[in-house]
Amino acid sequence: MPLVGLGPLMRLGTSVVLIAAALLPEGSAVAQFSPSGGAGLHAEESSEPPEPSVIEPPADAEEEEVKHDIAGFDKANLNGFFVQSRDAEFRLNIGAYTQFRYNLSWLETPPAGEDDFNSGFLFARTRIFFEGHLTKAIEYQFRLNIDDTGNFALLVAYAGYNFKDYRHQSRHNHGAWNLRVGRQFIAISREDWMFPQDLLTTEYSAVDQVSAVGAADGLQAFVGKDRGRAWLAVTNGAGGSKDDFPNNVASQVLLSARGEVQLLGDDWSVFNDLVGRRGRALGILLGVGSGYQISGPNAPPGDPKHSGQVTVDLSVGGNGFQALAYGTWSWAAVGTLQSSWGFVAQGGYFIFDPWQVYARYELVDPGNIPDLITFHALTLGTNLFPLTWTNRIKLSVEGGLLFSAVNQTLVSPNGIIGWLPADEGNQYYLRFQLQFGF
């Protein structure tokens, strides 16, 4: 039979084989070698093995390689909203919160012509944060404050350099340290070192009001190793953030230091606040802080040329509780050496999430300062935390009792701390506070 007569049969056989190959699973030997696009479309093509196919990367391949979101909200960060570069080298975090209060105050013996009862609303403070890092080593923070009268102030503005990463777990802190330059809070007292949102109570204690340095301008270095860490600072001293050049009336220079050691535990995050949320490990922290200040030539007459303080605090924190006790001794050279001291003891306990109860006792003793009496106050309250991952959202109800005539003590009366001017007798307050932000 002529070969030409087999042509239709050969073509038919070839088509059957190719159709069968197309119907086989992709992993079978025939399917692996079948042309792309389906056998029926290529029945007349050469039977030579095809060239290896090259898969072009998709147009958005660069996007698929991005490991970090360029914007979003991070619950693990104090200020959650962020914008960052694709490699996460640059990052900007933004946050804000306010403390809105309704106060009721009773005076046993009001000043002449004054009412024995006062009440009203108050925005105690509003804080706005811009913080982050330019690289993994270079950090920055800007913090604005709006006070109860609506005045704006640049509370914090610093740049920092992290020479070595710091970690919460003590066993990972092998010589971590950094340096911050600019306006910042100074590490002496643990209470004053805390953000207002992270306090146990609605407000700082009267002891803190009398002795705290607050924000100042200068340099502050930090070092952390294993279970110990320390801060060293050279700044323009107490109230230094409110001074200008050349009329610095507060101080010429303040040398300060604070050291902390964990007597029990190895997780520093237990002591990131004074609240003591549930789920934390047991820890005990001992801290010591001190400062020495030299007043400048523009200081008002009668201001001490030399002054200083020493603070010792002990904190115990664990699963749903935290307690703090500290004492501070302050001195000033005003002709003769004058000294005073203060003491704070406080503790809070979560009955259940999200409900916490707390108490605080505070004392300010004038020491050898003449014509003053001792300040005694007791505070009781409760906090409700709707969210487990932040202290920024909080509802508080708090009552306070002052056992002294505040005008005769070292403490300056004002509506923020809750004690109003009075020359005689005790006073009481009831406060409702809504703290909220993002």
Q: PLM features: residue spans?
A:
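N-terminal secretory signal peptides that target proteins for export/translocation
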Residues: 1-10
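Bacterial N-terminal signal peptides
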Residues: 13-26
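N-terminal periplasmic/intermembrane-space "pro-region" immediately following the signal or transit peptide
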Residues: 27-99, 106-109, 169-173, 268-270, ...
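Outer-membrane beta-barrel pore domains
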Residues: 63-73, 107, 114-115, 141, ...
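Outer membrane beta-barrel
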Residues: 80-240, 249-266, 273, 277-279, ...
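Active-site cleft segment of glycoside hydrolase catalytic domains centered on the general acid/base Glu
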Residues: 245-247
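Low-complexity, intrinsically disordered short segments enriched for Gly/Pro and polybasic residues
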Residues: 271-273, 284
